[in-house]
């Protein structure tokens, strides 16, 4: 069950759900329910000791709890709520009903303890506290309540915000109780390292590389007399710092009044510092000319090395309100007073002009985009161009504003986007860049007219001139017979225009010149208009033939280059990509450019500790080799690994692409159903990426090799072998036994363990028993329908993880899923080691080889790849699994007719080994409208339920068993046709016409 509150735990965030059931009853004897969400900042105390007494706070938010229509029984549903990862939540229900009540919590297929009690108002209270929210604890929580009057169900849906990476939050200060010291706190995931940065100088001169800077990696600071004091928190995402706001009475006041912004509920800290030759002076704080109340300030003093007295007076408020806004003035009997303006806001803001801006620059002009803004809290920002993101730097200005500049445009015309956000606000500003260029002119002529074409920016204008055959000068302007077509403009590029001259007898036999001009200059072309024959002749035949010769030579060289490149085909790129959505539509996204990220050397593994074996796969760009890695998982232990590498003559772009893939994998994290990164070798030699080794190869060949060993149930196997396998299925100490459905949900794992399972065995015993069980199962060398379901479930679970990490796979197929011990399957991306030139599954389309039969329509026809296009590919993968490795669309070649079939909504027939329910899932994955396809969390839930049902049916005649499938599916909620109508709706089963 979810981790309950523990004594003494410090929680960064507490979210409380309350559902209050009042005594008023409708005509149908249904209770009136009000669901409430209450957010808590809980930094000083832990959640209550018992889940029966959760915290309650102010500022409730109505979740609009309503009776669910068309549901069996009385079901109330609260609005879906998203919480941060590692948040702590309490689900609470108050029942205003006479008599005793009984209750039951149900979460992901499992019943959880429920202990109601009564409060002072004689209301029944049911609560559950979950600490440090993880992905496995997100889902639907059902509370079944039975009173003397009626029965009803309350449904809470809790999900984790789908952020690209973890969080790093700006630290803040708190006074240590009974001591003159400050505590620095940062609520971040993963847990940050907190450090104090002390500097003897102020502002820009206080650089961290300066010898005057002192760093202290501790959370409590007693040395509070320094000139510049900052607290910084750092984790995998980087570093965030907060400066202790200081008024120094010995410094000359700033030209503009210093300003400090805070949000309601945040702590306020202002330090007033003064130095004098003796101790005969004091400091006071005033807010709007009124002395601060006692308890909102404290003073410290010390003597410096030159025997001068240093006094500091802190003004602080533990949780500010709107009435704390105003001018805070620090006064001294020996120094001029100084003030600061403190502004308290309800929520964060970003103030800047968001109107789009257009710029025109010359080809070699130095230019930077810039955005000037005022924001609180500090923003996170990116610059984006052509779906690529670039680092964003900020610089503070004296007037409280900040500025961000982007100069790395490389004079590429187009649309540039500045995006900024903080915890409460978002801001986007668009820029358009045009490059001014002199027009370039091309000319052609026929028997009746001459035409000239030009591109340039700004829009060029045209003139035609007639040249005398006795003089090279062309001075006589032609105005009759000239027709200028309407100009077109390339997207964020040059203007393309043309002008045509209709021939007349007056100009035949003469040279004419067409000229295009704009503010950058003029370009001209000369044409000879001949009267005999339909074709014009260029005046200089030598130049004409020389041009033809150069063109032919260019064509020959280009052909040779194309032939050379054809062998190598296209530049290497990882199919797995992390995306950043930029708009409300899934189609508005760009791939995260990991070239700008730093590689974390903690992943570096000594290449001398690798002993290479055989080649597992080889392709146009690289190969994957089996190897033995010594000490990569545990000192003194060797394991088998798969090493991904480029071929010897890889160019710099391919090495850069492989390094980008490495950086992405380090950010991705690990999952049981993903081929996980174990380490890398990047120093002093070729780049090696070290992955988990899967001993049984890819799922496609695994299924094909097991066709003769397939049985629908274990009962068939026992009958066929006269129950000779029965001793194999005697229960091991760690086996899952029928009828034992009690589970525990661990906050740091997807795994489920029985309450009476392996808790009395050592780790070595458990590892030995598990290995022994796996070897016995694999010796059977059989494949069952439950195995197929388990494969489908595990792949969906892996894709659910990738969806949570904002990743798209783009080549999901059975050939890209690997099988290892225990029939565990793992999604991989070893396209580098696949020879797509000779693989018939990859078909030439445009200038690329693509896995056409696995691709969604939007990917095939529009080049759009989203998690929904991966769902389509997953449907094809399901078809592969339940046909035991048959190639999709059997007997249908990939030609123009195939593309028409896809556009017309054609679907494959039900595969031989699939049930009707599985086939319906396939059809829903193949919805032409991507919005009607199910999500991977829905697919995981449904397949987990199917797997549980199949398990019950298959083993009903067996006293003891060991499941072939890892039991991770048991932590999924049951699939409900009422709860997931979108998954099996007729709209998802039948394509739009």
From Swiss-Prot:
PROSITE patterns: IG_LIKE, PROTEIN_KINASE_ATP, PROTEIN_KINASE_DOM, PROTEIN_KINASE_TYR, RECEPTOR_TYR_KIN_III
Subunit annotation: Monomer in the absence of bound FLT3LG. Homodimer in the presence of bound FLT3LG. Interacts with FIZ1 following ligand activation. Interacts with FES, FER, LYN, FGR, HCK, SRC and GRB2. Interacts with PTPRJ/DEP-1 and PTPN11/SHP2. Interacts with RNF115 and RNF126. (Microbial infection) Interacts with human cytomegalovirus protein UL7.
Topology of this chain in the membrane: Single-pass type I membrane protein
Main location (coarse class): membrane
Protein name stated in the entry: Receptor-type tyrosine-protein kinase FLT3
Species of the source: Homo sapiens (Human)
Lineage of the species this protein comes from: Eukaryota, Metazoa, Chordata, Craniata, Vertebrata
Active-site annotation: 811
Consequence of substituting residue 835 to Y: In acute lymphoblastic leukemia patients and in acute myelogenous leukemia patients; somatic mutation; constitutively activated
Modified residues (Phosphoserine): 574, 759, 993
Family matches, as Pfam families: ig, PK_Tyr_Ser-Thr
